Amino acid sequence: MKMKRYYSFLLLGAVLSCAPTKEEPVLDKLPYFDLKGFIDLEINELEGDSVLKISEINGEKQTQELRYTVKDWKEEFASFYQADINVPSLVTAYDTRTTPDQLIHELLPEAKGKVKEITIRYVQNYPAWVMFRIKDENMFYQSTTLGELFMNQVTGKIDQYKLETTQKVMFLSPTHIKISGVIH
């Protein structure tokens, strides 16, 4: 009798575990600049290109000449992907301003979000410069990241990028990380 009851609960658990999960809704129209889509589009153009990469951690520099695949570029630009703000929970969280050559998304003071600002500068209606600021903090940890991406106006491809991060964990010294790359 106990075995029969055990198998009944096991079967019920298996059936319930197969129930469809609630997925995050997909936005019909993106409310903000499509940073993720832009990066995806641009890194496909960089397949096999080489980059002179300078990494600096707490003042210690390392310079490398590297050749990246699309997968490598996606990893290199992970911070840019993290700065994408086109998610349903942030649909009303940003103030959007425009000038003749810029689009600026800035987190509203009462809104919660890690991405504080995204600025896109346009030349001939195409992004020439993209910048984002991320700040994440809690009682034990604080992190700020500034990212910039520059487009070559002649080739129409990503020309340079910069990432600067400062991480501070309670009771430890801050870690300063700078990464820059010149693509050729």
Where are these regions (language model features)?
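Acidic/histidine-rich, surface-exposed loop or edge segments in extracytoplasmic proteins
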Residues: T21-E23
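Gly/Pro-enriched, hydrophobic low-complexity segments
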Residues: L103-H184
